[in-house]
C-alpha cells in the first residue's frame, strides 16, 4: 500500500529517495499516466445501450449513429436505430430506416423483427406478420424477436401475443430489461393492468433503477392508483435527484381530483 503523505523536495536527495520509497520506488515522472479514454465503436455502443436503458431514446439514436461511423455493417447499431425511432413514435421513418439497413444485412433476425414492429405500428399488419415469421426462422432464441412478435400480434388484436411475451420472459427470466420492454409494449396498446404487472416484475429484478419506478408510477397513475403512484415517483426522485419527470409527475399527481381516480377504477375493471 502506498503511503499518503505531503512532502516537499527542497533539493535534498535523501528526501527524494524517501519519496520514491513511499511511492513504491517511482517518482511522479516515472509513474504511468492515466489511460486516455478511447472513443471507439465499443465505447459508443456501450453508451448507446446505457442511454436506451435510461429511456433516453433520442440520445441513443445519435449514439448508434456514431457506432455506424466506425462500423457501417453493425447489425446491432442499425437495429438499435430502428428501435429508437419506434420508441419515439416515428414509425414510418423506422420502416424506411429498416429497409435501408436490410439492404446491407438482409438476414439479421432482430433487424427483421424491428421492421415487423415498424410495419405493424404503421398499419401494414400482413407485412408485419411476414417479417416476424422471417425473424423467428432466422433466430428463435432471441427475447427481442419474441417481444417484436407480441407487438405485431397485439397490433393485429390476436390473443397469441400473450404466449409470445411469456416466451420472451422465459428466454431471459432474470432480465429486468426484457420485462421493462414487455411492459412498454403492453402500455402502448393500452393494456395497463398487464403492463403494471411487468413493471412490478422489472422493479423486483432491479429496484435501484429510477426509470422503472418512474414508469411504474405512470402506469399506476393511469389506473387511478394515486397513493402507489406517489410512492413510485418519490422512489424515482430519490434514486435520481436530477430526474425532472419525477418531480413533474408528483406535481401533477397533487392536482388530481376524484375524476381521474374514478376513470382509473373503470380502466382497471375493464382491463381484467
Regions found by a protein language model. Give the residues of each.
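Helix-start (N-cap) detector for alpha-helical repeat units in TPR-like alpha-solenoids
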Residues: 41, 75-76, 109-110, 142-144, ...
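TPR-adjacent "capping" and linker segments in tetratricopeptide-repeat scaffold/adaptor proteins
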Residues: 22-43
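Structural signature of tandem alpha-helical TPR/SEL1-like repeats
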Residues: 54-62, 88-100, 122-134, 153-167, ...
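TPR/TPR-like alpha-solenoid helical repeat scaffolds
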Residues: 151-155, 218-221, 243-261
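Alpha-helical adaptor scaffolds
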Residues: 117, 144-204, 211
